[in-house]
Amino acid sequence: GFGRLHFGYESLCERLLKKMRKKTNFSDNIFFVKFACKFGIQLPSANIICGAVGEEDVDILECIDNLHFLRFYYDRGLFRHNIIPLRIANNSGFYQMLPREELARFDRNEIFHLLPEAVKQGVDRFALFDFCAPQNDLWEVFSKINDFYYDHAYSYSISREDGRVIYTESFDSQPVVRLEIGALGYHILKETNSKVTGPEDLVRSCLKGKAGIDEGHVLAALDLLKEKHLVYFDDGYRSIISVIDTEPEFR
């Protein structure tokens, strides 16, 4: 089987992934990380791009918030976040898109300033080297919180007690959350465990053969599970994925 895999990770923020014109979303990233860690596959290239074109404070704050959805999978031996700045050269896809005033922000290069002035004059610096822009200070906050997750261990268990499904979450081996998951919530977790699911398919599955349940109940259950960081989905309930693994069923 596979021992190591490289994949396009790039960000924990849906908006940033769109700004970088990526075809994947954060739900895809969760799915990939979840099952790679389950099967012991190393992910050495979980690169997080900082300084992306169009990046805003709110995007970095979303990245910080979304770190918690991956809390069970931080393992420096398997899955490590690498924060790297976006670098632009004249053959980069973004180079032609950026107006000159925006390109001026990309002025950081370790070598260019060492060149003699005579060499630099009249030369398109982007033809010689790639450059990055100054980093937003919020990335330092992201880095510190990211390190916190790697320095501590989250775990969980799912059990059945008197016919009830009980979810227990621990932080550094100490229980911190105990939650009864109703039949509908547990069905959602199982349906979204092994694939990224759309809202129509999930609602259809939840309503099949079940009286007294409508779409509103399903969306309310999804909201609660996301509030507890047990499922993730983007705006409009698209791309739903369970954060936890429901196989084996109880452990």
Specify the residue positions occupied by each region the protein language model found:
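Short, well-ordered loop/turn elements at secondary-structure boundaries
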Residues: 1, 161, 226-227
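Conserved non-cysteine loop/helix-boundary elements of the Radical SAM core domain that shape
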Residues: 1-76
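Active-site proximal loops enriched in glycine and acidic residues that flank catalytic Cys/His/Asp
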Residues: 9-16, 21, 47-50, 90-92, ...
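C-terminal scaffold of the Radical SAM
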Residues: 38, 57-187
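Short loop/turn segments at secondary-structure transitions that flank enzyme active sites
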Residues: 52, 94, 231
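Short catalytic/ligand-binding loop motif for oxyanion handling, primarily in non-cytosolic enzymes
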Residues: 53-54, 96-97, 241
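Long, charge-rich, low-complexity alpha-helical segments
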Residues: 179-251
